Design a protein with these regions (language model features):
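A charged N-terminal "starter" segment
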Residues: 1-111, 116-132
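Aromatic, loop-rich ligand-recognition surfaces of beta-strand-rich domains
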Residues: 135
């Protein structure tokens, strides 16, 4: 792996013929700090924006410990690379199996719902849990 100080350095030294992924941990840190200082609410990172493990791991190190997750694989990713972080299962449609895995296996307590049917599924999958945060 090569290290470049700026993306422009990469292009100048090694013009890419195919797409190139660039990891910029400093940019993640800068953005995390900016949002915490300038946003008055709780900062949640939407895993779907960039599910790279290095991003998920860098966020708690920079103060962001809440994640918007939309699937069990995203939940598992956060559990692995940002253990102890708060997760909100925000996908509008989720199976009872996914809800149960989120709740029982990974401690997710916040679930988004948009219909009565989704509420019924959340309650059924969690055994009518009393510690839910439903939004």
């Amino acid at each position: 792996m090569h290290t470049y100080h700026k993306p422009l350095d990469l292009v100048r030294q090694r013009p890419p013929e195919r797409p190139v992924a660039i990891a910029r941990p400093d940019a993640v840190a800068t953005a995390a700090h900016w949002f915490q200082e300038n946003f008055k609410g709780d900062v949640f990172y939407a895993v779907k924006a960039n599910p790279s493990p290095w991003v998920i791991e860098a966020l708690p190190a920079n103060g962001v410990t809440s994640f918007d997750v939309a699937s069990v694989p995203e939940i598992e990713l956060v559990a692995q690379f940002a253990p102890g972080s708060r997760m909100a299962f925000m996908h509008p449609v989720k199976s009872r199996a996914a809800i149960a895995a989120a709740y029982f296996d990974h401690g997710v307590r916040t679930f988004a719902l948009v219909t009565h049917e989704v509420l019924v599924n959340i309650l059924a999958a969690t055994g009518d849990a009393k510690d839910l945060n439903l939004i």
